[in-house]
Amino acid sequence: MRVVILGSGVVGVASAWYLAKDGHDVTVIDRQDGPAQETSAGNAGQISPGYAAPWAAPGVPLKAIKWMFQRHAPLAIHLDGSASQLRWMWQMLRNCDTSHYMINKSRMVRLAEYSRDCLKDLREDTGIQYEGRQGGTLQLFRTEQQFDNAAKDIAVLDDAGVPYSLLTADQLATVEPALAKVAHKLTGGLRLPNDETGDCKLFTERLAKMAEQAGVKFIFNRSVEKLLVDGDQIAGVLWGDDIIKADAYVVAFGAYSTALLAGLVSIPVYPLKGYSLTIPITNPAGAPYSTVLDETYKIAITRFDDRIRVGGMAEIVGFNTQLEQARRETLEMVVGDLYPDGGNISQATFWTGLRPMTPDGTPIVGRTSLKNLYLNTGHGTLGWTMACGSGQLLADIMSGRRPAILADDLSVSRYSADFRPLNVAPLHDAHPIR
């Protein structure tokens, strides 16, 4: 089957890889001059199934108001009055109750755990290198309340069968030695030993080369104008005066998927702006071993080979990609507080990207009402964590196989009024934002 994939971020390239493995004739189209040039370029570097959770959670609306008056707030909202922004925010608010949170988190953990397994298989099969580490993730607490609240996270992890260990402040240095100097600032941490890290951009670039060697065709520097429709199916992709035709089409355009699909398929995907710093390591002993998450500021600090990636924050500002100095100061403050001797902040590279976020936090993977149009978008802050699983899942669906995990509640049909999801095991309450 001839397949056209729109988008060459980590999700689009992973989709191309798994579809090519199934013997399909795959073409990937992107407006950039290479893969992973936008949202996949500078993310926090985490592959963290254990922390897969929606931003829409109980208590978040009140916290958002409080954060409006904080200098280093993890979430910022700038109202522009647009219908798309207001509609998305209203949908997110409707998902901030406990019942919706439980359902949404269960979906996300299911896909994230599966995706890590797919990545592990891919790594073993191909030997792909991307400065990856299998050193786990450590969530750091600065207050006793945060430490006590970890019991809720532990209940969720128990339900999902995710290994963990709860550490006191004195024990943190056993897994992150550089924290010994700052342990007095912390109350403890929650460690997930099965989480991984890696350079998402490097992974995507190398997987794209492998996919190309497997027969995938990449067309860069082409801006897609619209999808052409004939009856109940897509007839082609238009750019300029050219039309490319295929048997099936996959939209993996991230935050730009919504506009491309306007008038064809309604999806609630909205850009959530994030930031990162990439810092050269000057003292390996003073740098993180793997990844730590600062629970107070929602900032992740990740170790690559000779660099530290510091990423986080969320701004609801539409498609604004301007670099804000205040956000850089927050990133510098957190990494300087926890790892003051690890790297040279003055030589850091500052980056921003637009994560494609759904109001319920779960990505949209699968079929649409148009019989040859498929979606793989809306992964929010977890595109790197969920990419391989989403790609394999989509390849299974398009190849006529039964997916290895429940997939009906990952498709866009879950937003229809008559959708009735299959029963899933309930989760205890846990909040990703406190």
From Swiss-Prot:
It holds the Pfam family DAO. It comes from the Bacteria. The lineage of its organism: Bacteria, Pseudomonadati, Pseudomonadota, Gammaproteobacteria, Enterobacterales. Oxidative deamination of D-amino acids. GO terms for molecular function: D-amino-acid dehydrogenase activity. Coiled coil: none annotated. It comes from Yersinia enterocolitica serotype O:8 / biotype 1B (strain NCTC 13174 / 8081). Pathway: Amino-acid degradation; D-alanine degradation; NH(3) and pyruvate from D-alanine: step 1/1. The gene is dadA. The keyword Nucleus does not apply. Its EC number is 1.4.99.-. This is D-amino acid dehydrogenase. GO terms for biological process: D-alanine catabolic process. InterPro entries: DadA (IPR023080), FAD-dep_OxRdtase (IPR006076), FAD/NAD-bd_sf (IPR036188).
